[in-house]
């Protein structure tokens, strides 16, 4: 039962007037959703201003929406995901950022055993609407510690959805 899952709005585009890079489109989408949803919060590693995330996807959002809704977390991935799960179960809409896919492994148990199975384990009484933003691949030529593509591990987990932004 996905009745309480994220509803995707139908949007029609007449024409695209501005060309922007994908990370700026992500920033615009996050900003737009925060304007429409007072329960949405963003937190993670270096997401608040002035940095706005390692790739600047959240740049300007803590200034625009306040440090109560966009804030930095400790560099502790399991803590980020665990906190997001708890907040989602209490009607918040957390969007969390893990700086690089390579860093997600300390949180894998919570994603697999808690987040992904919440609806099933509660017989549809609970849902856990968490968005985990994770840059993947070799964009910065980071080698061993910044270039993993983790989607193959996560795509087989029932209870989660994987989305890649695209033009």
Question: Where in this protein do the model-derived segments appear?
Answer:
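Thiamine diphosphate
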Residues: 2-166
């Amino acid at each position: 039962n996905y009745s309480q899952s994220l509803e995707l709005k139908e949007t029609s585009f007449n024409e695209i007037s501005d060309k922007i890079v994908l990370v700026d489109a992500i920033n615009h989408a996050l900003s737009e959703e925060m304007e429409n949803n007072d329960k949405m919060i963003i937190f993670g590693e270096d997401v608040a201003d002035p940095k706005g995330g390692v790739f600047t996807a959240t740049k300007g959002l803590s200034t625009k929406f306040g440090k109560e809704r966009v804030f930095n977390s400790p560099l502790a991935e399991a803590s980020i995901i665990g906190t997001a799960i708890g907040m989602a179960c209490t009607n918040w809409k957390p969007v969390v950022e893990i700086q690089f896919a390579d860093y997600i492994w300390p949180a894998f148990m919570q994603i697999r055993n808690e987040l992904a199975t919440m609806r099933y384990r509660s017989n549809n009484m609970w849902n856990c609407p968490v968005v985990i933003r994770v840059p993947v691949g070799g964009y910065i030529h980071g080698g061993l510690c910044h270039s993993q593509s983790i989607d193959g591990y996560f795509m087989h987990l029932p209870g989660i959805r994987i989305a890649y932004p695209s033009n």
